[in-house]
């Protein structure tokens, strides 16, 4: 293919077409040719950085290190993103070792690279909480909520944070501050879980006060759920009503044929019913 060497943008265009076709070796050649013709072509620099990033972070970092200051400035977002990825991996390794304070220090560096990031703030807060710096963790999440009051990601992250620290009612109240039309599937799933927890908590209290029939009636009014069916099965098993227990476990298995709790429960019921019959 004959290309007019004076027109670096024509070569860049060929690189973009190759990139769109995922023909990365050809895209790399065209972008390199573009840079030989015009070292200031920031689109070619960006194209190469993205190709190398797909291959490995190390290759992308080596490429970035070889650039001139002005070329490097044109892709500072890619450089920040690579740095962020590397810090995230290091922080995760420290979290897995229980080194929470060291992990938090790395999360702070990530937040400096990406200020206001909901999920980095969440991870930093979780690490601080685990490191015993709980008021600092709470303050970070509260400030984030004030900065981004109508951001569904923030609402979901703060809801997760609160519910993870035994503050289910506060989590629900926070979620309800966001108009329902803005709820995403993650928020809806979290709300369902929190409401289900509250219902089960109330039902367990009723049962413990001797009102098992009332507790059971309350659970049966709820939308079908594996947790509720397993609870009803467990209660029936404890009062040796094996027919009811078996029916509740079967309900679970109809929805989730591989549910281990229901399979084990049914086996226990069959053994207990056999002993009773014998």
Language-model-detected regions and their locations in the chain:
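Register position in tetratricopeptide repeats
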Residues: 2, 20, 50-54, 96, ...
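Structural marker of alpha-solenoid helical repeat scaffolds
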Residues: 2-3, 37, 69-70, 113, ...
């Amino acid at each position: 293919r004959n290309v007019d060497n004076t027109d670096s943008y024509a070569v860049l265009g060929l690189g973009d077409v190759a990139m769109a076709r995922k023909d990365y070796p050809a895209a790399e050649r065209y972008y390199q040719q573009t840079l030989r013709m015009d070292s200031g072509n920031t689109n070619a620099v960006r194209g190469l950085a993205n190709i190398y990033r797909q291959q490995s972070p190390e290759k992308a970092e080596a490429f970035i290190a070889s650039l001139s200051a002005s070329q490097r400035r044109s892709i500072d977002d890619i450089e920040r993103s690579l740095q962020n990825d590397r810090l995230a991996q290091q922080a995760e390794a420290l979290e897995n070792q229980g080194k929470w304070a060291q992990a938090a220090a790395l999360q702070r560096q990530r937040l400096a690279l990406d200020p206001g990031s909901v999920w980095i703030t969440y991870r930093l807060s979780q690490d601080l909480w685990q490191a015993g710096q709980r008021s600092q963790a709470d303050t970070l999440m509260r400030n984030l909520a004030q900065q981004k009051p109508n951001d569904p990601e923030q609402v979901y992250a703060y809801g997760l944070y609160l519910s993870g620290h035994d503050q289910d009612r506060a989590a629900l109240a926070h979620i309800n501050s966001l108009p329902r039309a803005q709820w995403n599937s993650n928020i809806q799933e979290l709300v369902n879980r929190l409401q289900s927890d509250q219902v089960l908590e109330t039902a367990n209290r009723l049962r413990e006060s001797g009102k098992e029939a009332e507790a059971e009636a309350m659970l049966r009014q709820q939308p079908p759920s594996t947790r509720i069916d397993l609870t009803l099965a467990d209660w029936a098993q404890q009062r040796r009503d094996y027919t009811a227990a078996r029916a509740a476990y079967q309900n679970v298995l109809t929805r989730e044929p591989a549910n281990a709790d229901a399979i084990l429960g049914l086996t226990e019921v069959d053994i207990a019913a056999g002993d009773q019959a014998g």
